[in-house]
Amino acid sequence: MFRWGIIFLIIALIAAALGFGGLAGTAAWAAKVVFVVGIILFLISLFTGRKRL
């Protein structure tokens, strides 16, 4: 998850340097979404823990 966030962040930075505002905004938004989803999944797994059967 975090890997995808970093990839989208790099794409946004490159697009911003080249002046593609729409593409940079979209990639930055996607990076934020992936990051937030990753944090939420991490917190859920942290609180629920591994269940032993």
Curated annotation (Swiss-Prot):
Q: Where is this gene product found?
A: Cell membrane
Transmembrane feature ranges: 4-24, 27-47
One GO CC annotation, please? plasma membrane
Please report a single Pfam family linked to this protein. DUF1328
Tell whether Zinc is among the UniProt keywords.
no
> Any S-S bridges, and between which cysteines?
none
Q: How does it sit in the membrane?
A: Multi-pass membrane protein
Q: Does the keyword Membrane apply?
A: yes
InterPro entries of this UniProt entry? DUF1328 (IPR009760)
The alphabetical list of record keywords is: Cell membrane, Membrane, Transmembrane, Transmembrane helix
Family from the record: Belongs to the UPF0391 family.
The molecule here is called UPF0391 membrane protein YpsIP31758_3502
Task: Identify the species of origin.
Answer: Yersinia pseudotuberculosis serotype O:1b (strain IP 31758)
